[in-house]
Amino acid sequence: MLIAQYLWELILFLIIIVGPIPLSLSLAFENHKENSNYSFPHFLLVLLTGWSLAQICIGLILGSADRLNLAAVIIAEMLICAIGLILIYAKNQKSFSFSQWQIPQLKQPLIPSELLIIGATAFAGFVLWETLATKPTTNYDSLWFHLPVIARWYQTHSFTFLDAAGNWIFEHEQARVYPYNWHVLSALCVLPFKEDFLTAFPMLIAWVLEGIAVYLLSIKFGATRFYGMAAASLVLTVPMMLNQVNTIHPDLPLAAIFTVALYLGLSYHSSRSQSELSLFLASVGMIAGIKITALVYAASLLGGLAILEIKRFIVNKNFTPTNFRIRHIKPVLVCGILCCLFLGGFWYARNLLHINYPVGDSREINIPLQPVAPPSPVPGPKPPVPGPKPPVASPKPPVASPKPPVPGPKPPVASPKPPVQQPTPTIPAPSASPLLKIWQSTLAAQFNPSNISHWQMFGLQVLIRLQLPFLAIALQASSAPLALIQGKTRIINQNNIILTVVLASTGILYVITPYTSGTAGEAIGQLSPLLGFNLRYGFPFLSLLAIAAAATATELKTRKQVIVAVVLISSISGIISNTIFDLIKNASFTGKSIVWGSWLIDRFKSHFAEAINLVIKILAPRWPDLGIYPLIYVGLLLLAGILFKRNPSLIGLKNLLASLKKSSYIMIICVCIALMVSATWVAREKRDVARAELYRGIYEYIDKNTVPNEKIGFFLSYRSYLFYGKNLDRQVLYVPFRADRLPAWMDNLHKNNIKMVGFGPLTEMDEYTKLALSWLTSPEGPLQPVFGKDFNTESVLYRLKY
């Protein structure tokens, strides 16, 4: 890549990032005037929340107008930036210079233990940035339906889920009606680079928001600054939390915006700030548009604030109806209400207009039409051995398309073996209703407290996925009754009641969230190791548990030395565990291991030695990747220890910073910019190398052997994103595969001018599909292999012979 091109793309990216900042600053300054308890973390929360809201609104407006392209986005960002600067100038004409902006300062200087906590968390954040910038994702769901959505938006400049032939772009029925608010941020990050570099950057923003919100809520519920920082750090360094940043999963953003909205609602309840109420309403709308199950969280927040306001009106006799009402509605509140309706209703209104959902059943949607029409089955060419249909007297009904896998990863299947005995047709049992199956997929429906194996499976997944940070949080929070007994002051107050209710509510919402059992709800009383992968649905509960732990630690005055030690160990152990999880996932992705992480964890129950040996075998070639971060971390801790020992109060450092002249600050800023430019350059180069290794060179093959906008058909693949190419400029068409309609399927390929098809790795399917694929890819079949070797374990490409 030419340095000029790289610098130009980086400048465009920075324009997109900086655009909404003045508008967010104007909101933060307005809030500063209304809230007497304003603090620097509160300022950062308002700034980042306002930035996220503005960016998503820009993306939704442009995407709905079919203008989600780089030029339109840059113009919109510049316009938003100008509006923000005008608002700041109009409200602060006398102090418009940057040096006079009212950015709040820390009320008390940071002590060494707090600096250590901040430093450990910042180190984890740096590692996350390095990971998302240098390593492409191998996450199952991200490659299956999250990233293909973003790629298609990038190609069409609009929010479409259809390919060029009018078919769905992925084989996930439910994903067609998901809301995608947070994905809009990722789509904006794709535009300047024309590839998925920094596509996961919004996940890092969500990670930061999560930490700030947990800290502020801890303070709100009575914790001191030190314990609030510790709680936030422990939540952020949970291995499962770290492992979600380099994905496009909406669960971390959901937890982050939920805790943000909870804090803003409680802050408004005490400060009566209209800007905070505006942000609260807009955040609630954003939550509703992040995920379908988030509708319950959004409704809970609105209902909770309504209850608090009604209680305030009833209990306080001096609180007259005039004071209860907002006398003068400011424009900022009107904007918040409009954002709530727009962000919360956009995707659901779109679904109602485009595909008649949820009014109609998504399985009965006939628009767009599938390419294979429903005439009577046409028998396909017979493979050499055995025939594609069993030699039974009764006719066999047409074989349906294979169902999409259960959400979450599944282990690749081994190569198909020829059946020993053909199955006898049976009358299928009536399937359960969709709503019943959804309920049966929840942990509440499947978990049997009297079943020891259920406790073992769930406990082992929690222990290995969440590790020391969760154990420390849970242990401290569980000592709350002790604080109630020993407390000399009144413990049962409104704040503690609110915290208890919200904690219990988020716990209940987790266990009744679909797929928390790891199963699809086909039967009752079953748990799957996939429940460990789906622990991410419980992030809101984990956040509230950390807040409760901070409040409890404050009441019990838990020793700070112990807390600091736990935080420092949790930070590096979380980083190492996250790296291990990635290496195991990558080994399964590339076919070097056939065991997925959740199944490997479950194997520790009965085959401990075998599981340990398998982990060592996977990690053996990657020991340097595991050792580099601990070495840097220990080195930084030693440096900090020497610095604190020589100057505990850091007066010398403060005096040095105070003595710097304006020119020195400018020089430091220039050096930081130069480091950022060079670091991102190196990161992109490293990402290209890692992508070629993990994706096995499929991007390189597509770039060299196909032309932009060439059509590539795919079927039976949960990695369809790989077929778009590095620059996302290949037309990827979904071609539903029917083993009993091979001639019609081939005609459909020719009709759509598809000369190359991709599929694999394969999941569970019927024997006839396996036999049909074996014939298609045989020397006598119509497909010629051009990339990949084993479609059972990797994505492969074939060209049509005729």
Locations of the language-model features?
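Hydrophobic, aromatic-rich transmembrane alpha-helices
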Residues: 19-21, 187, 214-215, 312, ...
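Membrane-interface transmembrane helices that cradle and orient dolichyl/undecaprenyl
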Residues: 220, 261-277, 311
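Aromatic/acidic, Gly/Pro-rich catalytic loop(s) in extracytoplasmic/lumenal soluble domains
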Residues: 755-802
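Membrane-embedded, hydrophobic transmembrane alpha-helices
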Residues: 1-107, 463-467, 471-474, 554, ...
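Transmembrane-helix motifs of polytopic, lipid-linked glycan transferases
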Residues: 22, 81-90, 198-222, 260
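Short periplasmic/luminal acceptor-recognition loop of GT-C membrane glycosyltransferases, typified by
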Residues: 691-696, 700-736, 755-764
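Membrane-lumen/periplasm interface segments of specific transmembrane helices
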Residues: 307, 311, 330-379, 414-480, ...
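Transmembrane-helix signature of polytopic, membrane-embedded enzymes
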Residues: 38-46, 196-198, 214-237, 270, ...
